[in-house]
Amino acid sequence: MSFKEISTIRAIAMPGMTKTFCYSLLTLAIIEAVSFQSAFAAESDLRNEQSLVVTADTDDDSASYPARAYTVPATRAGTKLNLTQRDIPQSVSVLTRQRIKDQNLQNVGDALANVTGISASQNDSERVDFYSRGFYINNYTYDDIPSTQTGAWNFGETDSDSAIYERIDIVRGSTGLMTGTGNPGAAINMIRKKADSKTFAGDLSASYGSWDNQRYVADLSGPLNDSGTLRGRVVTGYQDQDSWVDRYHKRKKFLYATVAADLTENTTLDLGYDYQSRNTDGPTWGGLPLWYSNGSKIHYDRSDNPSADWTHYNILSRKVFANLTTNFDNGWQVRVNGTHTESDFDSKLLYMTGYPDQTTGIFDSNGYGYAGWYKGLRTQTAVDAYATGPFEMFGRQHQLVAGVDYSRQRNRYLYSTSILSPAEIGDWNSWSGDVAEPDWPAWLLSSEDTIRQKAGYAAARFSLTDPLSLIAGARYTQYSAHGTLADTEKNNITPYGGLVYDINENYSAFASYTSIFQPQTYRDQQGNYLKPVTGKDYEAGIKGDWDNGDITASLSMFRIEQENLGQIQSNRYVNNSSENAYKSSKGVVSRGVDFEINGAVTDNLKLTFGATRYVAKDADGDRTNPYMPQTSLKLFTSYTLPMLSDLTVGGGINWQNRTYKEAINPAGETERVYQGSYPLVNLFARYQVTRELSVQGNVKNLFDREYNTNPAGGVAFNEPANYSVSVNYSF
């Protein structure tokens, strides 16, 4: 049985319309949005009737799964070889379109916060960092093209709207083979929606929720000519919301458009454009001060906002991308991907530091308000080309992928800062944000850098025996960074190796190894870049799948050894900027275990349940990044009632253990500030009114648990209990 036949059996048909007069509507939308407009399926086999093996790449792994599934039959995560999760010797999680819809995960950050083994550190209202296995995640890829995020500046990567993505793949552990510099925490691959429909179809949604949160999204797709060889898709949306935080208001607009052209029977060209704009008034910057000058803790309301009335945070991102795919009759496939991104931000911010008097609310002589006006521009250009397919050796079939890539990132950051005295701030106990905007001094250059990566990579999956396979590969990377604060060139070879042994038709054991090489964009207080992170990553475990891959499970143990890992220094900044200062740690070791089960347990019940426990310490025995939880549990379920098939209900719980940070108290002593363990409970229900129309309700933080989202510094509160109601019309 071929992979296409399996996909056909598994597919759930989407309601559609074939009226050709609808072509013009989509054509106009595509032409308006995209100004640059200019199949062979490999054979597969089955382990048995209940377990799927993918032995070669299909032309599009992102579209080959049922619309309402929580799993996918195959993914290129980690190696670019199109494999089942059982055949990948690393921990892999998948968030499908249906899971994102059920849980109402409106941006990438919301999605990542609900992934097994990933934890969030919400620095303030606009900036959130993600960690896995004790390490900061900075590898984000778009359709397999790497893009590095820095912790210093926020260009909105994690606030990118989820409506434009078909799914999100996550590989925990080092992925240097495919992403270049290897981050040992995790790599996030966002797979964009494609123009793959040959009939006109659409999805319209509107939602309203707490704090006047209004959201409208349209997703239209269909053919642009009679034969369907030219297709288009547009996803656009608008969101406007207040917040539980006083004086905070946010507006978001996005437009995503893509066209696909079948140049021949075996060659397809995809072109696309992604525009995202976010404008925020009253954003917070860091956390609220912890103590009064007498050493007593300050008790805040969740609504307290330390920002001034004149503050804002505006982000604009534009991406253009292209993909050319050719499938050959011998099962080989060649892909060339390219993207160009221009992102900029403009932010006026205010941060309070020091200790106010408990009675008068006036900050002590060491306290002040730090006002900053920041502008940044980042351009990224990346090209990736690779070939993949089967080959025969020693009488057995194997798979190979080989490719080259190039990326260039240019960054330019400007700043202007001013100090507000305690007298200008006034009584902190009655702070309302009503303070005069400073007379900003002339712009100064914070940094201007160009980072380049050139690489070649290759990996092969060797079928050693019927149950045993070996994945081996390597990547050669040339890395350079030149600019105002960096002038370095590094070359590195990153090896990768993994074994997978099929125990029986449902279970496999695996083990893998890869080295770590991560040049750091972190800087110390003097503005010097930290040395590259180096190390090793080991992982071993067991995986299973059932019902043709509809449900998957994994249990893995890992050990990560690192040198020169950058750790944040509380209340320390680079050259008086808003950039957090870091220091290098020696001999960091993270070891632990994670578990996940995901998919359709029955015809009516889908769930994702994952748990992670790790311990990360440096050579002195000190805990690494102690503000991140070392134990976490995440559960989400969706259940369609058998007696009332139009009603689906579900929910979940996220739990994490106690964390702490070290801060300087008014006595000048280092004090540990703890955040206790907490659970968050979420619920949802959806009723299918007609075949096309559905209504859904979501409740977040059902029991209104309160905690500090900024464990690395200050106080910032999580969102209280809140709701949303959405109406969705599909055709």
Where would I find each of the regions flagged by the language model?
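Short acidic/polar hinge/loop motifs at secondary-structure boundaries
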Residues: 120, 129, 145-172, 191-192, ...
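Extracytoplasmic beta-strand/coil segments of soluble accessory domains associated
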Residues: 70-93, 109-146, 166
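Outer-membrane beta-barrel translocator/receptor signature
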Residues: 148-149, 164-166, 177-255, 263-267, ...
